[in-house]
Amino acid sequence: MSIMKSKIAKTLVVVVVAIAIFTLVLLMLWEGPLGTLTEENLTELNGEVPFRFKDSGSNEEGKDVTLSKFFVCLNKVLRSADDSLSSYLCCGETSEEEGESKKGKYVKNAITEARNMMFRVKDSKDVILEILKKGDKNRNELAETVSNAFSAVETSEGSDQESEGADEQGKIEKLNTALAELYIWIWLKGIPEEDKRTLQFRKTYKENQSVKNLLDGLDEENREVAESTILVKVGKKEDSMHVIEHILTSIFQANGYMEKGSIKQAYLSAKASVAAAGGSLGKKVSEVSDNEGKGLIDSLFGMIGWRNNSNNNSSVSKKKEEQGVNS
């Protein structure tokens, strides 16, 4: 009889331990609306590095966009972003071309990385604050890092060597991290200039099926927030836009710096080609003006709007203007 009681007691202990472990796992896997952030974290962040958005004041009573509502909606949107949406946010249209498909994968991974940084790591508030301060210290650093990282990925693609393949993967991971940091910076603080592509995106994004699917997939409360209006600093003014518009436009703008990375490589090739062909009155490559290559590439790719240059047809001796994200 005592042996039977002993077996029952041991069985009960095992069951209790199993239930405790299972409950602990569930608690670890469960993610609140704000993830590892708290409302206090948001208030502290906004106090240290003021965000570029606020409630518009034109939403219905009781439906104003608080910091908590915005971040919860952002978390849901990032979690719901699929490959199709990532591709659209990369090039502004659905593209089956291999190059755009690869960029779409980088964007999808970067969106996931940004969500991890903001809502899933233990010290998410500190991670966000570090990114915001980095952007404040040097407004161009985050954008230039994306451009350089993408250029590095481009030059390493197509390698068959195992060691070089591992190096390529490392460069892709750096690109994903750089993009994720730029997303966070533009969502919360950075103010990039709006070019024609951005304005066109803002006018047409609602018509895209991937965006429609995203909104349809949100719960009622977060869809309501996504379609509420906020005031966002754009250039030297504040512009009224929907929350979802701000979130998606910021990703689209950040992705544009991958294009700049591509142009940078093409531009270098153009300079070499001009010199090799005896162009520029026989100048050496080192003597070819920056604006000569830039004008050629801008014409080929239609990317004049990405550059903060109002005199593309001016003298070739004019200094090349710096580009980057304004704060």
Swiss-Prot record:
The keyword Transcription does not apply. Its main location: membrane. It is found in: Membrane. GO terms for cellular component: membrane. It is a single-pass membrane protein. Residues 162-227 form a coiled coil. Keywords: Coiled coil, Membrane, Transmembrane, Transmembrane helix. Residues 157-167 have a biased composition (Acidic residues). It comes from the Eukaryota. Residues 149-170 are annotated as: Disordered. The chain crosses the membrane at residues 12-32. This is Uncharacterized membrane protein ECU05_0140. Signal peptide: none annotated. It comes from Encephalitozoon cuniculi (strain GB-M1).
